[in-house]
Amino acid sequence: MAEIKQWFMSIPIITRYWFGLSIAMPVLGRIGLLNPYHMFMTKDALWRLELWRPFTGTFYYPIGPGTGFHYLINLYFLYQYSKNLETNEFVGKPADYLFMLIFNWSALVLMAVFMNIFLLMDPLILSVLYVWCQLNKEMIVSFWFGTRFKAQFLPWVLLGFNMILGGGGFFEILGILTGHLYYYVKYVYPRDQGGELITTPAILYRFLPNYTPLRSTGFLSFPTASSIRSQRNTASNDSSTSSSGHNWGGRGHVLGGN
């Protein structure tokens, strides 16, 4: 148990909470401690001001004989690509990464209201994977059966794979569209047109200030809660600097890839 706890606490903070909630809520629903009916996001529930539904609809997934494997694949992609983004492109900038998730989640909630989508786990994970792939287009990734290709094609391979094997693809398309929306407004438009369309709200820097990663023996050390609190005195400076833009460039690394 100590090893599991140590591994879990080594996950960067935003990915850790997302990963943990994506395990806890489905398991609690499966064993009957939470009513799955109250987890789904429905338009009628929102009209009744059941405002927790967009949150539970993001973390809950119905686990059963026909969905268990897909759920595990979701957890794998969540852990792998969220962690890769948070420890590479967004390293030292947890507020910026959280804002990316909030942006993608908000776009998906709006789509879900108009399209009667009940669960958001699949498209949100795909949106994060898409952003990582766009920021690491030329990286060679490995897929099933030893196939290898550039990262920019991975979202489309997953879309085709699910369409062929599962007859689905709708959630993958939503995830790709959402990820592309964020990538366009955050990276493409400022690069091609100049000026930023979105910036991280200053309030997020108050709770998640930027920090300088500490490196020792080749491993990335994340700050403790006390060290984060000690940096909050300078959070306002970080937020004012960050509002003028960030250099989020960098190169991710696929676990299990090349």
Task: Kindly give the residue locations of the regions a language model identified.
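Multipass alpha-helical transmembrane domains of eukaryotic endomembrane proteins
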Residues: G57-G167, I176, Y187-V188
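Membrane-interface elements of multi-pass transporters and channels
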Residues: I31, N35, N88, I117, ...
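Hydrophobic alpha-helical segments of integral membrane proteins
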Residues: P26, R30, L108, V131, ...
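C-terminal transmembrane module of polytopic alpha-helical membrane proteins
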Residues: M1-P12, I23, E50, N162-N258
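N-terminal TM1-TM2 helical hairpin plus the immediately adjacent luminal interfacial "cap"
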Residues: A2-I102
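Intrinsically disordered, low-complexity regions enriched in proline, serine, glycine
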Residues: G29-R30, P36-Y37, I140-V141, G169-I173, ...
